[in-house]
């Protein structure tokens, strides 16, 4: 049987560079080597593309020591990786690309745009849905237009805030009650997110969030449980049972997710049946509204007192580490890790096949 050549992208110019490496390593270790020839492609924090030549089990933060310069050709007649060694370029054919790039410059439609130009099938959401889901402000606005329940929010731009700080502080305090969450609009893994309990906290939180983006979100804090759903599919969508995060800290921060490792995942979430069904229905609706394909994780809040469900965000390239919710939810729902990878790759090929039927010329 001819093996599919699957290029796995990891690293990237992102605050989630290290997490991406862990996710990609986990995916590559769980790929069926009888079906796939794995081609690991790393992107450094400076944006350099490199073909990783070391062993998958040895992949860590020092991966660049075992690498050769490369890049994906945007020429769709090639559908290949270009390897550059000793000033000579050679083409390596690629059947599918599996982007495992969390956050900016990977999960936001930028790499997806390059892969669209190349014509190579790729796992996950397309350019538009990736960009919208990455930008929490646009995602919130679209959800609002579609009548999806969510908490009160305000979008603040850095240049406007710098010119009228006092105005925005007063506006926030008039529209919200403490505590509030302050988030960079384009960030993942809770990087740059703070919970503000008073004005002093708020000023510091805004400063912190603006370190990671020029646009931030102010959100009303809700006394809520953090619930997540894994969604899989293109035209036909499968929604997993919901899972719950019990944060080891006050909220599911970057540290709680990846450093102290003591947050608890409860699968399935212990919810009333009608709340579970509402969450699954909303997850499927949101997936379709945002025109997602391949995969996404849809996150919600559930009020601890009333069980009211609120939309939080969509992650188009969810974590695939050993402690990540997405593969755990899918496994609980009957799709083991290796089968999940198979399905994602087949969905990528299916999506690419559909695009090939589109006419780009009036001729013929």
Curated annotation (Swiss-Prot):
InterPro entries: ATP-grasp (IPR011761), ATP_grasp_subdomain_1 (IPR013815), D-Ala_lig_Van_CS (IPR000291), D_ala_D_ala (IPR005905), Dala_Dala_lig_C (IPR011095), Dala_Dala_lig_N (IPR011127), PreATP-grasp_dom_sf (IPR016185). Residues 140-346 form the ATP-grasp domain. Its cofactor is Mg(2+); Mn(2+). It catalyses: 2 D-alanine + ATP = D-alanyl-D-alanine + ADP + phosphate + H(+). The keyword Ligase applies. The keyword Cytoplasm applies. Mg(2+) 1 binds at residues 299, 313. It comes from the Bacteria. Binds 2 magnesium or manganese ions per subunit. PROSITE patterns: ATP_GRASP, DALA_DALA_LIGASE_1, DALA_DALA_LIGASE_2. It is found in: Cytoplasm. GO terms for molecular function: ATP binding; D-alanine-D-alanine ligase activity; metal ion binding. GO terms for biological process: cell wall organization; peptidoglycan biosynthetic process; regulation of cell shape. ATP binds at residues 173-228. GO terms for cellular component: cytosol. Pathway: Cell wall biogenesis; peptidoglycan biosynthesis. Keywords: ATP-binding, Cell shape, Cell wall biogenesis/degradation, Cytoplasm, Ligase, Magnesium, Manganese, Metal-binding, Nucleotide-binding, Peptidoglycan synthesis. Cell wall formation. Belongs to the D-alanine--D-alanine ligase family. This is D-alanine--D-alanine ligase.
């Amino acid at each position: 049987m001819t093996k599919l050549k699957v290029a796995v992208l990891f690293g990237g110019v992102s605050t989630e560079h290290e997490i991406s490496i862990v996710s990609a390593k986990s995916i590559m270790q769980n790929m069926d080597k009888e079906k796939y020839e794995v081609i690991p492609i790393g992107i450094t924090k400076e944006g350099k593309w490199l073909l990783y030549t070391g062993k998958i089990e040895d992949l860590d933060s020092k991966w660049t020591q075992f690498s050769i310069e490369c890049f994906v050709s945007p020429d769709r007649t090639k559908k290949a990786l270009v390897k550059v060694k000793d000033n000579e370029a050679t083409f390596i054919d690629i059947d599918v690309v599996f982007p495992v790039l969390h956050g900016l410059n990977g999960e936001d439609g930028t790499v997806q745009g390059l892969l669209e130009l190349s014509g190579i099938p790729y796992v996950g959401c397309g350019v538009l849905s990736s960009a919208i889901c990455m930008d929490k402000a646009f995602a919130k606005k679209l959800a609002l237009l579609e009548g999806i329940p969510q908490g009160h929010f305000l979008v603040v731009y850095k240049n406007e805030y710098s010119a009228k700080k006092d105005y925005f502080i007063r506006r926030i305090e008039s529209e919200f009650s403490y505590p509030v969450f302050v988030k960079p609009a384009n960030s993942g893994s809770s990087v740059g997110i703070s919970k503000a309990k008073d004005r002093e906290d708020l000023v510091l939180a805004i400063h912190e969030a603006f370190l990671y983006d020029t646009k931030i979100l102010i959100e009303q804090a809700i006394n809520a449980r953090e619930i997540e759903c894994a969604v899989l599919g293109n035209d036909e969508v499968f929604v997993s049972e919901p899972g719950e995060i019990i944060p080891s800290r006050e909220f599911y921060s970057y540290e709680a997710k990846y450093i102290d490792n003591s947050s608890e995942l409860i699968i399935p979430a212990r919810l009333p049946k009608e709340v579970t069904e509402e969450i699954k229905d909303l997850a499927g609706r949101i997936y379709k509204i945002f025109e997602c394909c391949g995969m996404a994780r849809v996150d919600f809040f559930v009020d601890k007192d009333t069980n009211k469900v609120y939309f939080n965000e969509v992650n188009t390239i969810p974590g695939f580490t050993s402690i990540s919710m997405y593969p755990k939810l899918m496994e609980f729902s009957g799709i083991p890790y290796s089968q999940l990878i198979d399905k994602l790759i087949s969905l990528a090929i299916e999506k690419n096949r559909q695009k090939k039927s589109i006419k780009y010329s009036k001729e013929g």
